[in-house]
Amino acid sequence: MGDPGSEIIESVPPAGPEASESTTDENEDDIQFVSEGPSRPVLEYIDLVCGDDENPSAYYSDILFPKMPKRQGDFLHFLNVKKVKTDTENNEVSKNHCRLSKAKEPHFEYIEQPIIEEKPSLSSKKEIDNLVLPDCWNEKQAFMFTEQYKWLEIKEGKLGCKDCSAVRHLGSKAEKHVHVSKEWIAYLVTPNGSNKTTRQASLRKKIREHDVSKAHGKIQDLLKESTNDSICNLVHKQNNKNIDATVKVFNTVYSLVKHNRPLSDIEGARELQEKNGEVNCLNTRYSATRIAEHIAKEMKMKIFKNIIEENAKICIIIDEASTVSKKTTLVIYLQCTIQSAPAPVMLFVALKELVSTIAECIVNTLLTTLNDCGFTNEYLKANLIAFCSDGANTILGRKSGVATKLLENFPEIIIWNCLNHRLQLSLDDSISEIKQINHLKIFIDKIYSIYHQPNKNQTKLLGTVAKELETEIIKIGRVMGPRWAACSLQAATAVWHAYPILYMHFSHSYSGLAKRLANINFLQDLALMIDILEEFSVLSTALQSRSTNIKKAQKLIKRTIRALENLKIGTGKYESQIEDLIKSDKFKDIPFNKNNKFNALPRSILLDNIIQHMNLRLLSDRNHEDIFNYFDLLEPSTWPYEEITSPWIAGEKTLFHLCKILKYEVDLNDFREFVNNNIKSNNVSIPTTIYKAKKIVSTIAINSAEAERGFNLMNIICTRVRNSLTIDHVSDLMTINLLGKELADWDATPFVKSWSNCNHRLATDTRVRQKSTKVFHENQLAIWNLK
């Protein structure tokens, strides 16, 4: 058999598609080799485990020349895999050629010229011993395969690629029809076949195909470049060019959203940029919609995560309204106090569609939305201190309203009715008790119906009106209804400014209205209502300010009540102008008279009613009277200094209840120091815990004006032209518009990187949906070919 130690035995593996057709006898003691071709080194080595055999000659024959199909035997001369016996084995074979009493385990080593001996790692063997292997492999086979293919790993009897699992996607190296195998990433590769040989061949084929696959090769290239950097950073470095192109697309989408433009405008914007030399592929409205969704999601995730990590106290503001498409929606806002901001921060949370307007549905929608944003029930129990909304029965009903159901889950929260709505209700309650006020309301509503007819009639009516007065007449809306004071003031002031022109119009077509305008009592009532509404408008505007808190609101309300008391004694700004206006040239054509059919308003009774209802609705709130007393503890100007002793026992008892309401512990030593310093001097520094408690008090929202602003933005976004937008899409657009920075200050790069990490395609990827191009007819192009 040749010189000892020099016998060369060549074998061929049953690899490739023919592997499943192998007819080799099923035997545990088989040896299999895989070759990738003459251009690659030795790829596989599987050791042989021997046992007793009565026919040693046949045994060695099977070792030296394994049984195989003829088609596989024809390729023997292509292989460069070699197996060398040791000296001991050759001597034993030469002495006992015909029989062996006991076959020893042969020792083989793979050699490639020059011959290099590799000793297996002991630690790797121990790891193999602890693994659950595929049912067609033994430990030595598994060890040698994992040694040869460094990327191969075994988990729970299944194969996977640790390199592909680490990188997962190709990033900038992505190509069309080239994808990383999900099975190799997730360790889900298993053998196929009904017998051991077929299953072994199946695994060899799968390993071979994955090893030579284009996607795996690109993964290997990425890993070679990641020697001194993490995989994630490497992908981003490889994607720099693509990211820069995608950033420009994100900036375009962001600008469209901030300017409330339809996302379909991106096609025109990108067409212009392509004309200027910028070429990318994310230029359809579908891509723009996905990008807007991603930006909104990332914004919320980052902002709300920071709030939760800071353990900030929060107040929830909600309101309900209908969209253009008549869908009932719930807008949710959140006001919180954070360390980096001196004043509370108001944040838009979401716009949600309501399946039903019953209280239970609203509560479920609210809590589900908050949970989706990361605010769990445990967090809300520890940090939710207040809930604010308008005075609708569904929301603030005492028996089964939203507020009542929230109190069942969070019993310590403060329920606050919007002060602006309460202000309007106090005015409505006052005028509803005086019948004469209805004449003014009916008249202005009649003017509204006349001048808000279809465009043709409106143009005819306003044809003779001066341009400066045309705008004022269009402003005339309804008054004394479910609208805030500023709206009623705008309508009444518009009538005041257009008074002579209205009389001229009505004298020709509406004689009844003209007679009413000629009644001096009507002019006096109009002036009085403008003076009253002006005070209400000033207060309403001040209450809507984001910087107004509970204490400041109380001061503003008391100031307005004093102004109305002064108006009761004297005359208002507009009332004092009546005599001069009647004598002026503008009013000279109006024959003023006193018509007893329309009596003047009982001025004193009206003002008394307004003052009384303002005190009842805005100041004498039994539900919040104790809370106001607790909050006064943080305002030294309200303290009864003549009763204060050191330490202030009564104040410390109140402090205990205040801490329970605010869900924040004020240090007792800080409070005592705060009291002592204020007794000695007025201008003192505020201790840390006292300062934070005052900030938490300011977190309580006093109105739902922000929710009204949100609905105003919703109406701007969801017009009749864009009514196909879903509620979720409108919510995303509102999120970017309300929470996003200005375009000049906004950095799109982090959003693009997170977009890439979510396996979305970048702007340079040609696999994305392409925008449709407008095809010009030959006749349209023909005119440009004229010479």
From Swiss-Prot:
Placement of covalent cross-link Glycyl lysine isopeptide (Lys-Gly) (interchain with G-Cter in SUMO2): 85, 119, 125
Free-text domain note: Binds UBE2I/UBC9 and two SUMO2 molecules via its N-terminus. The most N-terminal region interacts with the SUMO2 chain that is covalently bound to the UBE2I/UBC9 active site, while the second region interacts with another SUMO2 that is non-covalently associated with the same UBE2I/UBC9 chain.
Job of this protein: E3 SUMO-protein ligase; facilitates UBE2I/UBC9-mediated SUMO2 modification of target proteins.
UniProt-annotated stretches for the region Interaction with SUMO2 2: 42-50
Region (Disordered): 1-36
One BP term from GO: protein sumoylation
Pathway: Protein modification; protein sumoylation
EC number: 2.3.2.-
One Gene Ontology molecular-function label: SUMO ligase activity
EC top class, as a word: transferase
Domain of life of the native organism: Eukaryota
Protein name: E3 SUMO-protein ligase KIAA1586
Keywords: Isopeptide bond, Transferase, Ubl conjugation, Ubl conjugation pathway
Underlying gene: KIAA1586
Region (Interaction with SUMO2 1): 30-37
